[in-house]
């Protein structure tokens, strides 16, 4: 996916964190390609937020895809990340002690997706995810993030 689309979807995600409830702790710069050098933090999730009321931190990795496609198994789905990236997100979660969530936008535009899915990293062990599986994590488009039983919703 191209760089500009990714940034537009990250901006969409940031707008869902209402300032009265959420503090933005970090936004990944993703500048490795620009400086032609590896930057360790570029492999971290895109956004780190803290809930102001509960003082709980969450990391969010944003992935936009234009559509689902038919996979080798004959089911509609998408590849949300490469395996090595999933390992990096798992390591980040383990080392930092707070959960990583994956926000996937599908269809429409990166700034206004048709559908959105919010999935705990622990529920996405593989790079391929079927549409059927993702449906249980579907959230309303443009609905602000909230905390529910200490989970990001």
Where is each model-derived feature located?
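Non-catalytic C-terminal interaction segments of nucleic acid-processing enzymes
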Residues: 1, 8, 16-25, 29, ...
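Conserved catalytic cores of phosphodiester-cleaving nucleases, focusing on short active-site segments
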Residues: 17, 45-71
